[in-house]
């Protein structure tokens, strides 16, 4: 008997293979079957499937956001100053509102799917690893399993928020240029907020709705005010209808600054989270592969457990005449069926 957890592990494997509690099994067989049951069959495949799902989702969201923004931008090239085509600008606003709804719905649904899969993974791993010691489990410590789950879901959540913000903040750099031209101040200047507030306030006085008079508004003013009329950009100003108002200028300036900051900070956060997430998973994979090189691991994963009932072993015949096969059709979960007949002397 090796370790306090070995009896529990033996009983668990007996239940998996349909053996009676009184059946005796060898320690080497227990280690072999527990190893294959955990790392090669169920636990490793579940974790790999979850990691694959997360990475596919991340790749999909990054490609989709970049693609749709580029496609909408290419279809409306003349919406930007200094030659603002108002029809194209309205088309861009409509497309942005539609994409915003689509990505919010897509992101929320995928978050729920990944969360359900993560909960299933943690419950399944807890069930599989319950009888095993830390040295034999896929995760070295139970806490590491939850750290892995929390980190992965935070990573997915950040990707989702970042994808939605990329749609919301599309054209934000052009709006910053509009504000710089209107205020004659650099965005990096400490006085930019005050100067931009005064410039936009004066613009609203001279450039009345529908903000299409190039002579009074200028190309930058037309682009700025018409861009803020979209439903997506109304979230920036708190306006329920129409476009920018005097009361919404501070919120608009804050939103533009936040979008600019998002484009600088979020990619760094994503990169750090991705590196940590992949290093953690890589460490677990290497740990599993190193265990496969142990001399106690038998390569034939399809050998069923052999057993004999306590008290029935005699010295003359040994255990060979009492060996029996696993009932036909029964397998360890995840292992292919076999037809095993013990060799007779």
Curated annotation (Swiss-Prot):
Keyword Transmembrane: yes
Chief location: membrane
Membrane spanning stretches: 46-63, 101-118, 147-165, 265-286
Compartmental location: Membrane
GO cellular component, one term: membrane
Keywords: Membrane, Transmembrane, Transmembrane helix
Membrane topology: Multi-pass membrane protein
Top-level taxon of the source organism: Viruses
Disulfide pairings: none
UniProt-recorded name of the protein: Putative membrane protein ORF59
Protein's organism: Ictalurid herpesvirus 1 (strain Auburn) (IcHV-1)
